Amino acid sequence: MALATQSNRIKIGIRPTIDGRRMGVRESLETQTIRMAQSVAQLLQTHIRYTDSTFVECVVADSTIGGVAEAAACADKFKRENVGLTITVTPCWCYGSETIDMDPHMPKAIWGFNGTERPGAVYLAAALAGHSQLGLPAFSIYGTEVQEADDTNIPEDVKEKLLRFARAGLAVASIRGKSYLSIGSVSMGIAGSIVNQAFFQEYLGMRNEYVDMMEIKRRLDRKIYDQEEVDLALSWVKQYCKEGVDVNSLENQRNAEERAELWENVVKMTIITRDLMVGNPKLATLNYAEEALGHNAIAAGFQGQRHWTDHLPNGDFMEAMLNSTYDWNGVRPPYILATENDSLNAIGMLFGHQLTGKAQIFADVRTYWSQDSVERVTGWRPESGFIHLINSGSAALDGTGEHQDAQGNPTLKPAWDVTEEEAKRCLENTRWCPAVHEYFRGGGLSSQFLTKGGIPFTMHRINLIKGLGPVLQIAEGWSIDLPQDVHNKLNQRTNETWPTTWFVPRLTGKGAFTDVYSVMANWGANHCVATHGHVGADLITLASMLRIPVCMHNVSEKNIFRPSAWNGFGQDKEGQDYRACQNFGPLYK
C-alpha cells in the first residue's frame, strides 16, 4: 500500500496540563509535568507502530497548559502536525474545562498522576466531568498505587491503558478520510455486501468508492498494468505456488495450457486490484495517469459471485495474496480485501490489521461440530465441540501458522517481524486447487491450507441492525489440531480445496458462551474475521471510540476500557455501552 510520508503521518499529541498559578505554584510543577509528558511519549514511541512498521510519532505541546490560551495554542500546533488522538497528563490540579482537548473527533485520554503531594486525581475527575458534560467522552487513566512525586516510572497498569488507548485511537485516526472501494456490487444477496454509506461516513469517517468489475476486465484486455511486474510475478508463482487436488470431473478439468492461462489471469487480477486500491506510478509512464492514482482505499471488496465468476476466474488467488504479508515483491504489509464484497467483514479485517499489524483470516462460520457428530462421522471423540472456519477467498496465507515465536511455537507475526523463510514456509504449506466448477464456472485457484493448532485467535464481526446501527461481536479462543484422518474426513465432506481453521472459543458458562454451540448459534452473520491474539479488549476500546456497542464478548470485565462517561449509564457494562453509544451517537455525525 502507498505509504504515508513523514509529514502527513497521524501523530499522537501529548498535552501536559498544569496549575496555572504563577509566583510559585506553576514553577514548582513544570519539571515534573514535562517529565510525565516525555515519559509517555517515550513509551508510545517504543511500543506502538504504524502498519508500515515504523514506530509512532508523538508531538508534545510547546509548553505546559495552564489555561485556555495555551490549550488553544496546543490545538493549533496539533492541527499543523496532523495529530489524530491526544493524551493529557498531569500530576496536579489544573483548571478543568479551560485546559481540556475540545476537538469532537479526536479520541482523548487523561492520565492523572496518583500522588499525595498534588491533586492529580482531583483534576482528572474534574476534567472528566467537563468532558462528559460537554459531550466529549474521554478515557480515564489513574494508577492503583500511590507514587512518589519524583518517580518518573510509569506503573504497569497505567502502561497497559496508555498502550490500549493508543492502539485503538491510532486505528480510529488512521482510517479517517480513507476509502472503502467496492469492486462490483452485491454478491448473492449477502447483507454485508450491501454497502451502507451512512455507516462508513458517520461511524468511521470514510469515503465510499465504487467501480464495476468490468474495470478489471478493461485493464486485462487493454493491458493496463505493469508488464514487468506481471513477468516477475509469473516467474515467482511458477517457483513457489504449487497446484493442489482437482476435484472436478474430467470434462471440467483444464489442460496444462488452459491452467497456464488461468494463472496468468489471476496474477494480473491481483496486480490490477492492488492498483485500483492504492494506485501505481508506473501506470502514468504508460500514459494512464488517471489509473495511476488509485482510489485511496485502505480496504476493498470484490463481488465476484456470480456475475464475474460464472464467466471469468474467481478472486480467490488475488484475495489470498493481497491479504497476506508476502508476494513477489517480498515481505510487505497486507492489503485488506474482502471476498464477496462483504464490506462489514472488510472493516473487521481493517480493525484487526490496524490494531496488530498482522494479516487477517476471512472465513465463513461454516459448521458447528459436536462431540457426538464428530464421533459418529469419524469414530474419534474430541474433548469438546468446535467450529469450522472456512472460505474460498480472503484467508491470508499467514493463517497457516508457519511463523514462529521466540519459543518456536506457531504464530502470526506483523509484517515487520516476518522473515523470508517464514513467508516461504507459508507458501510451502499452501496448495492452489482448481476451483470447483459447479461454484465457479469461470475457473480460478483456491488456497488450500490447514491452520496449526494452539494459536490464540479473536473471532469478530460487525453487523448492522435497522433501528440500532452497527454492533460488534467478539469471541476469543484458539485454533486446534485434529488427528490427520479426522481432519481429512471432516474437510473432504465440506470442501477440501479451501483453507481450514478449527476453532474453539473460550467459554464462560453463561449466555452466548455457555458452550461452543451457543457461540455459533449467536453469531450474527455468515462471515467472521479471525485476528491473531486475544485482542478483544482492544476491539472493545476501539468500538467505544466509534460509538459501536458490543453485543457479545468473552473478555474479562477487568480488561474492559471505555470512556469514563459510560459509568453514568448504569452499572451493567453491556447495558451502559448500548445506552452511551445511543446517547452520544456516531463519532462523525
Swiss-Prot record:
Keyword Isomerase included in the entry's annotation: yes
Alphabetic keyword roster: Carbohydrate metabolism, Cytoplasm, Fucose metabolism, Isomerase, Manganese, Metal-binding
Pathways per UniProt: Carbohydrate degradation; L-fucose degradation; L-lactaldehyde and glycerone phosphate from L-fucose: step 1/3
Domain of life: Bacteria
Entry's Gene Ontology molecular function annotations: arabinose isomerase activity; L-fucose isomerase activity; manganese ion binding
Annotated positions binding Mn(2+): E340, D364, H527
Disulfide cysteine pairs (residue numbers): none
GO BP annotations listed: D-arabinose catabolic process; L-fucose catabolic process
Residues annotated as catalytic: E340 (proton acceptor), D364 (proton acceptor)
Protein name per UniProt: L-fucose isomerase
Origin species: Haemophilus influenzae (strain PittEE)
Gene label: fucI
